[in-house]
Amino acid sequence: QINSWKDLLSPELAGRVALPNITGTQGPLTLFMLSKALGHQGYGFEETIDNIGAKADDIVTFYVRSSQLAQLMNQEEVIAAPLGRFAWSRFSNSPLPFVWANPKEGQTGGMNVMIMTKGNGNEDLAYQFMDYWLSEESQTRIANAKIDSPANKKVKVSDEVAEGLTYGAE
């Protein structure tokens, strides 16, 4: 059972944990949460990186893709790892009894953004695309396909779909 982010570096889980590569979406988020759990101050992360480095032999791999992690977990080579909620469906449909942990330090979250280059000459088209992407119709399709959590608060999905997304009043 994972009660804290620092449990990922515990002797009990040594040799059974995967951490995300720092270059992926979950890498910096995991580094931040481990730093918080270990009681490190500031945003330099040197101490946290040193802690992870000291445990490198206890970490099965630093995964790059959630598909890689799913394979390792389904083969039972890894039993614990941080991952984004968007990838949870790969695990929730497994015959193995995976559960979502809720560490006392909290969960991580990322936010997708859309940007437009100033003076690009296609501002109207860019705004039309943004409106389309954020529309209830598009966001519902994206959520139901389990591609991403909806950004439009009018989107309604089934409980089954919601289980794999960041979704709801909170």
Predicted ranges, named:
Residues 108, 112, 117-170:
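Mature extracytoplasmic/periplasmic domains
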Residues 15, 23-27, 86-89, 105-108, ...:
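Solvent-exposed loop/turn segments at secondary-structure junctions
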Residues 69-72, 88, 126, 139:
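Short, hydrophobic alpha-helical packing/hinge segments within bilobed ligand-binding/sensory domains
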Residues 74-75, 79-97:
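A ligand-binding cleft/hinge motif common to bilobed small-molecule-binding domains
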Residues 21, 85-86, 145-146:
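Short secondary-structure boundary segments
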Residues 49-55, 94-118, 162:
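Periplasmic-binding protein-like
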Residues 16-20, 62, 79-83, 99-101, ...:
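Structural recognition of the beta-strand scaffold that forms the well-ordered cores
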Residues 1-77:
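Extracytoplasmic ligand-binding site segments that recognize negatively charged/polar headgroups
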